[in-house]
């Protein structure tokens, strides 16, 4: 192995470069970040070449954030365009093998940091680029030639980003006419387990990976060329619930790969055994109980959602490979799925989106709902959201009256509990029963005691009327 100014090992996966230990930040929420892999003819690739357009590492100022784009060109007899996204997703793996260099997210959301210790050992991104390409060709031998260009100049990054978005869109559209019921196998991905050990990403025709980078065709291509790699085949097994997207094969793999943490995953459910969330997801969904609706916030949105929480905080609550009822991480392309959270109302349950996300996915939002889904321009808190939904006649409003009626009925059923029939449970030491008003029993005489949501155990109770002293 060639000599590099930093150590290279899988042991560094999951290493975090904190702000206080950071030399520079590349991309991320404060700037632009991109990674893209392109299949090219062999004669168009200068093997192992690293090109830097813009300031190199030694020209960067400590503590600053810079725009960042990585464009990898790959070639080989077995290399084809279908493999681009597969190779692209491994960028996350191999960069994180490099000590002191942190990589998060994917596509147009890339966020990297270089530690002070690592920056002190190298004055250019060139050895970093050579190290990553060495790892690619070692782990994926079908790549025979490879070169990379790093962009750190704002205008160039913006240009590369626009071109890349068109490429990503074309990739995503390939699965539009293929659905879960049309195939016998799904695909799994464990790339994010270095950061989220119990995450089990299941990719089906109707559900893109959480990071948005792997669709069903990409999973198939990856499993074919690298059978021992992080993308693999999942036999669907028997269908348990079509609406929720539950299959025996998916449940089996969920239990196995989460080390028993979860025993089922329902692909199209928000509330019942939802898909696990890693941390690389593009969008996080959050339940708003006050309106019985679901809001969604994307990684790029810097403001607060109506619940008073921003993306980063919600991502922390949702991620880590957990199965959190009330929060759900997804890839943006899942919005285009005909099975989008169909078990819980689909689009009829969506009540809030940041305007930038709403504009981005406008073509897939049902026409009759476009004006009924609020943005930060319409609602910034729960009260204003509720008022907006009522004014626009959003479908969730109809559920509010039904829920209130059901609650009233439950309260009436619990209204009266006879003392003699009350379930008994010994109160804690020092517990004192609250004073209860004496009520006239009318023609029937006696008193009435009302206990709500109470479990009381008493060996003996004596209730007597206290007579006034004369």
UniProtKB/Swiss-Prot annotation:
Enzyme class: transferase
Keyword Iron-sulfur assigned: yes
Cofactor dependency: [Ni-Fe-S] cluster
Database matches in Gene3D superfamilies: Bifunctional carbon monoxide dehydrogenase/acetyl-coa synthase(codh/acs), Chain M, domain 3, Bifunctional carbon monoxide dehydrogenase/acetyl-coa synthase(codh/acs), Chain M, domain 5, Carbon monoxide dehydrogenase alpha subunit. Chain D, domain 4
One Pfam family this sequence matches: ACS_CODH_B_C
UniProt entry keywords in alphabetical sequence: Acyltransferase, Iron, Iron-sulfur, Metal-binding, Methanogenesis, Nickel, Transferase
EC number: 2.3.1.169
Keyword Translocase set for record: no
SUPFAM superfamilies: Prismane protein-like
Superkingdom per UniProt: Archaea
GO molecular function, one term: iron-sulfur cluster binding
Cofactor notes: Binds 1 [Ni-Fe-S] cluster.
Residues binding [Ni-Fe-S] cluster, per UniProt: 189, 192, 278, 280
Record GO biological process: acetyl-CoA metabolic process; methanogenesis, from acetate
Pathway: One-carbon metabolism; methanogenesis from acetate
Catalytic activity annotation: Co(I)-[corrinoid Fe-S protein] + acetyl-CoA + H(+) = methyl-Co(III)-[corrinoid Fe-S protein] + CO + CoA
Alphabetized InterPro entries for the sequence: ACS_CODH_B_C (IPR045822), CO_DH/Ac-CoA_synth_bsu (IPR004461), CO_DH/Ac-CoA_synth_bsu_3_sf (IPR038571), CO_DH/Ac-CoA_synth_bsu_arc (IPR023432), Prismane-like_sf (IPR011254)
Functional note: Part of a complex that catalyzes the reversible cleavage of acetyl-CoA, allowing growth on acetate as sole source of carbon and energy. The alpha-epsilon complex generates CO from CO(2), while the beta subunit (this protein) combines the CO with CoA and a methyl group to form acetyl-CoA. The methyl group, which is incorporated into acetyl-CoA, is transferred to the beta subunit by a corrinoid iron-sulfur protein (the gamma-delta complex).
Subunit structure: Monomer. The ACDS complex is made up of alpha, epsilon, beta, gamma and delta chains with a probable stoichiometry of (alpha(2)epsilon(2))(4)-beta(8)-(gamma(1)delta(1))(8) (Potential).
Alphabetized HAMAP family for the sequence: CdhC
Recorded family membership: Belongs to the CdhC family.
Protein name per Swiss-Prot or TrEMBL: Acetyl-CoA decarbonylase/synthase complex subunit beta 2
Gene: cdhC2
